[in-house]
């Protein structure tokens, strides 16, 4: 179990309060699909993913990105029980969707990049460390069913 300090929780919550879930979520998922094109195989039903502009403008990518980032909002509310919080999603991604666990970390890294882009002044090394810890912990929680 990952332990978050009071300072880390406060840092994550303070930035989260400013996040536009639709924008950051959509950009994060789009970056994942562009930078790591093999991840597109998990999104066959999303239609046209043949180019960067098609991915960035795809409404299904944006909608699913928002959904993914909303789950991070849930994680922030339950930072002391991420495995429990993500148990159902872990089962879904393992048993039905067959998503390879390393992809969770890749998406977490995309979220960090987009947050740094949108909040450059506030995304200090300390803020990055807190968010990196959270994205890694969420990735581990999502991969829990695989073990």
Swiss-Prot record:
Top-rank taxon, per record: Eukaryota
UniProt binding sites for heme b: 64, 93
Disulfide partners: none
One annotated GO molecular function: oxygen binding
UniProt keyword list: Heme, Iron, Metal-binding, Oxygen transport, Transport
GO biological process: hydrogen peroxide catabolic process
Gene Ontology CC: blood microparticle; haptoglobin-hemoglobin complex; hemoglobin complex
Tissue expression: Red blood cells.
Boundaries of every Globin domain copy: 3-147
Coiled-coil region(s): none
Record-linked SUPFAM superfamilies: Globin-like (SSF46458)
UniProt function note: Beta-type chain found in early embryos.
Subunit structure: Heterotetramer of two epsilon chains and two alpha chains.
Family: Belongs to the globin family.
Protein name per its UniProtKB record: Hemoglobin subunit epsilon-2
Gene behind this protein: HBE2
């Amino acid at each position: 179990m990952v332990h978050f300090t009071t300072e880390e929780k406060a840092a994550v919550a303070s930035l989260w309060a400013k996040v536009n879930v639709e924008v950051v979520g959509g950009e994060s998922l789009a970056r994942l699909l562009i930078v790591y094109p093999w991840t597109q195989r998990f999104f066959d039903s999303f239609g046209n993913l043949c180019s960067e502009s098609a991915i960035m403008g795809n409404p299904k990518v944006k909608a699913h990105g928002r959904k993914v980032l909303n789950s991070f909002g849930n994680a922030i509310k339950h930072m002391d029980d991420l495995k429990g919080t993500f148990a159902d999603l872990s089962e879904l991604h393992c048993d039905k969707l067959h998503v390879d666990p390393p992809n969770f970390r890749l998406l977490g890294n995309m979220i960090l990049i987009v947050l740094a882009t949108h909040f450059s002044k506030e995304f200090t090394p300390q803020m990055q460390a807190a968010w990196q810890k959270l994205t890694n912990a969420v990735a581990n929680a999502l991969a829990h069913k695989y073990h």
